[in-house]
Amino acid sequence: MKLTILFLVAAVLMSTQALIQHDGEKSQKAKMKFLTARTLSAKKRDVDCVGWSSYCGPWNNPPCCSWYTCDYYCKL
């Protein structure tokens, strides 16, 4: 009887571990997809960005490069 209970507990623990490990793989893949998409969008934005002392006002509003801020002109 005790041996049967021990086997059942071991089986439950092993199946729980397998489920947790499988979910970890899914979340790792999702994380990689998210980071890849974010990197690609950042690269796309850098192509469209304007550099230092470029006009970025309300009528013509291209994004400043990530290290600049826009206050009518991109500035550090």
From Swiss-Prot:
Expressed by the venom duct. It holds the Pfam family Conotoxin. It is found in: Secreted. The keyword ATP-binding does not apply. One of its GO terms (cellular component) is extracellular region. The presence of a 'disulfide through disulfide knot' structurally defines this protein as a knottin. Belongs to the conotoxin O2 superfamily. This is Conotoxin VnMEKL-012. It comes from Conus ventricosus.
